[in-house]
Design a protein with these regions (language model features):
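Active-site-proximal segment of RNA-dependent polymerases
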Residues: 323
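Histidine/acidic-residue-rich catalytic or RNA/ligand-binding cores of hydrolases
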Residues: 340-343
Length: 426
């Protein structure tokens, strides 16, 4: 891969060239590099560092209209006004056929080439086994990784980082794009929230330090960043000098001009900066469509258009870097199989997950399809669950990131590799 550097010093040279090209920074020799990057040069090189981006669709996305089971007759009986039409030639107002049974919403058409190139996989009828229909509880369970257990204090992604310690870890190893650190990244391992790369504000886990990272460091009260404050200042200064406002996506990629597009573009900036980023979190809200959800057009369509264009732009922008990168989407639960009286859908159960990247065995819809006949539905109203979300995440963590202690990441869950969906190349 052209962008990957097999030796630490060459990796830093790439960073200098990148910043010179993209943001106008001028650095000469190792003396200009932050201390944590200097130590990374002296340490044993880690070629082909793997990275993971988690995108949370907050609000409970409608998986049945995102990945449409057009081969299921019951689908059209249940959704007379919001169902997505079956695929047909020459029309942009129908599901985009994936395999003769499933199709994606037409607003996700930019993702179809990635599916055909085996860079995108889908897991249907996936999610949390907990029966709650509460957004708050379901999100908490999905982020803690312990469905049904409210006493868990840390998040599964933080535990994953904690089980794979690095001697010379970057203060930017775990980053959330946004003003608050999500439940998923809270815990003992250092993690930061970055509202905007252009503003250079870093938020910590404690509300005491909401004034920004400088105030937090002065107070030294946050355990997640204690001992790494100076290095984080250096990393922030490095980004500031890089002038991220001048960033230009590569390969002709064009991100949508919205919160999700801006966040994924900044995720790309952080990855390309070679400052040790390993896991990143992005929130994407607005999926709770009880009223006037719409079908081919409408509220859901608008959200999916933004999502599809953003993910496609990110994939294009990353180029060869996608060989070491996986993006996974998740939502707290799905929606009811039947549309409601307001041409929307209500809180349901199972959903779909997207997994994108070079390590992905794409071009396939994974998971056992439970069916939509009345006797096949969960509680007579929802898509039934056949794949636990922890199996999907567990496979990504073990086969991509290299986490070996999945019992510590998902306590109480039997994450036997033989039960993995099989969507990541080991």
């Amino acid at each position: 891969m052209k962008h990957e550097c097999r030796e630490g010093v060459r990796g830093l040279r790439f960073s200098r060239r990148y910043f010179l090209k993209q943001g106008g920074i001028a650095m000469v020799g190792l003396s200009a590099m932050p201390a944590f990057l200097q130590r990374a040069v002296a340490a044993t090189p880690m070629p082909n560092k793997k990275q993971l981006v988690v995108l949370f669709q907050r609000g409970a996305a409608d998986g049945l209209n995102i990945v449409v089971p057009f081969g299921e007759p019951s689908y059209y009986r249940m959704r007379p006004s919001i169902a997505i039409p079956e695929p047909r030639r020459g029309g942009g107002d129908a599901a985009v056929d994936l395999d003769g049974f499933f199709g994606i919403h037409p607003s996700l058409a930019p993702l179809e080439p990635l599916f055909q190139k085996n860079q995108l996989a889908i897991v249907h009828a996936a999610g949390s086994p907990d029966p709650t229909r509460s957004h708050f509880d379901a999100q908490d369970f999905m982020e803690s990784g312990t469905p049904g257990v409210k006493s868990t204090e840390d998040g599964w992604l933080n535990r994953a980082i904690e089980t794979t310690p690095e001697e010379n870890a970057s203060p930017f190893r775990a980053v959330a794009m946004g003003p608050n650190l999500p439940r998923m990244l809270r815990g003992a391992a250092p993690a930061i929230a970055l509202p905007d790369v252009r503003q250079f504000k870093v938020m910590a886990q404690s509300p005491i330090v909401e004034g920004g990272f400088e105030a937090m460091y002065a107070q030294t009260v946050d355990r997640a960043l204690r001992g790494t404050g100076t290095e984080t200042f250096e990393a922030i200064d490095m980004l500031r000098k890089a002038d991220p406002g001048k960033y230009q996506p590569e390969n002709g990629a064009q991100y949508p001009n919205g919160p999700l597009g801006r966040n994924l573009q900044q995720v790309g900036q952080l990855i390309k900066a070679d400052i040790g980023v390993e896991v990143l979190f992005v929130d994407c809200g607005g999926w709770d469509n009880h009223v006037n959800e719409g079908g081919v057009q409408g509220q859901l369509s608008n959200l999916l258009r933004d999502l599809g264009q953003t993910l496609a732009a990110f994939h294009q922008d990353m180029g060869d870097r996608m060989e070491n990168l996986v993006v996974v989407t998740m939502s707290e639960f799905g929606r009811t199989a039947h549309e409601n009286g307001n041409r929307g859908t209500d809180h349901g159960h199972a959903n779909c997950m997207f997994v994108m990247g070079g390590p992905v065995k794409g071009g396939h819809v994974y998971g056992k399809w439970p069916g939509l006949e009345s006797h096949q539905l969960n509680e007579g109203r929802d898509l039934a669950l056949t794949t636990d979300f922890r199996s999907v995440l567990g496979e990504i963590l073990e086969n991509h990131i290299g986490v070996k202690e999945l019992k510590a990441v998902f306590p109480g869950f039997d994450n036997n590799p033989r039960k993995f969906p099989g969507l990541i190349r080991a």
